[in-house]
């Protein structure tokens, strides 16, 4: 089996996850095009310079080809291609998972790659971006919706996926409201479940009544 893990918003290095790599391949993926394993100053310079506020640039977000998410999703596709090329992969079990921005990537990965068999988006970001115009809840940390960004809404991508899906939602999450997770769940075609945690904020490891 193989698992590909994606991570939340930010400018930081990604390290390998040996703890999860028991009896399976685990690939932890950096959403960006920079190097891992560099000195702290390397990431601080990117965080305060080139990548400051990445993905929030309104001009870039007018075109699906120029938005920051374009490169992010190309890296996502390549990560899956790489894992599937490994001779150790059994050729049939492929899981994608992640929290927040990583949850968004996991849901989109499921829609883009027909070989994904299990998707676990945990409080995924960017779900139901156009929903606010219809009176749906909107997170308090959101990107201004544009027509171009709808290409990157996980709610649409999940329609292409018919594998197993487990969505995790926090009922106290004001960054990625659970209504967006419900829209994602409702659009999925295959075997699916959604787990709501009472009072849970945008933690990624929600504790409380399920």
Annotate each PLM feature:
Residues 1-10:
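Short beta-strand element of the alpha/beta-hydrolase
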Residues 12, 16, 78-140:
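Primarily recognizes the serine-hydrolase "nucleophile elbow" in alpha/beta-hydrolase
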Residues 13-14, 34-36, 127, 203:
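Active-site loop signature of alpha/beta-hydrolase-fold enzymes
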Residues 20-74, 131-134:
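Cap/lid segment of the alpha/beta-hydrolase catalytic domain
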Residues 26, 119, 194-195:
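Hydrophobic/aromatic anchor residues within beta-strands of the central parallel beta-sheet
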Residues 31, 120-130, 154, 199-200:
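Active-site nucleophile loop of the alpha/beta-hydrolase fold
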Residues 130-188:
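The feature captures the conserved acid-bearing segment of alpha/beta-hydrolase catalytic domains
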Residues 182-210:
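C-terminal catalytic histidine-bearing segment of alpha/beta-hydrolase fold enzymes
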